[in-house]
Amino acid sequence: MEQLVYIALLGALGCLCRYFLSGLVYQVFGTSFPYGTLAVNLIGAFLIGLVMEFSVRSAAIPPTLRFAITIGFLGGLTTFSTFSFETFRLLEDGALLIAFVNVLVSVVACLTCTWIGIMVARAL
């Protein structure tokens, strides 16, 4: 039960971070492309690579904390559902190129960020 509380608390924190970070990104870059969603997903992809690799190589992050961070915080921070909805809206609006770029950049860049997070954790 205690683990669920930690996951819920960090999940709420992740959601708030997503709200504020994506809002800030949209203020800076505008809304012609899903920049805010891409930004939070890139950050989350880097962090999950870092946290998971570091926790596998070290006992510094106990499983309870690892679950709270990955399932809770990063689950709240990142959003596949918003990515899907925004991409669908782009397709629906006839912005096929922007939708394609969003999918391509999101997948390739998120995988790259995860890899970078893993490499950083291995270097620590």
Swiss-Prot record:
Superkingdom, taxonomy of origin: Bacteria
Entry's transmembrane regions: 5-25, 32-52, 67-87, 96-116
Amino-acid positions noted as binding Na(+) in the UniProt annotation, renumbered to this chain: G75, T78
GO cellular component terms listed in the entry, alphabetical order: plasma membrane
Pfam entry (one): CRCB
Single GO MF annotation: fluoride channel activity
Protein keywords: Cell inner membrane, Cell membrane, Ion channel, Ion transport, Membrane, Metal-binding, Sodium, Transmembrane, Transmembrane helix, Transport
Cellular localisation: Cell inner membrane
Topology in membrane: Multi-pass membrane protein
Principal location class: membrane
Regulation: Na(+) is not transported, but it plays an essential structural role and its presence is essential for fluoride channel function.
InterPro entries attached to this UniProt entry: FluC
GO BP, sorted A to Z: cellular detoxification of fluoride
Catalysis: reaction(s): fluoride(in) = fluoride(out)
Function, as annotated: Fluoride-specific ion channel. Important for reducing fluoride concentration in the cell, thus reducing its toxicity.
Family: Belongs to the fluoride channel Fluc/FEX (TC 1.A.43) family.
Listed name of the protein: Fluoride-specific ion channel FluC
Taxonomic source organism: Geobacter sp. (strain M21)
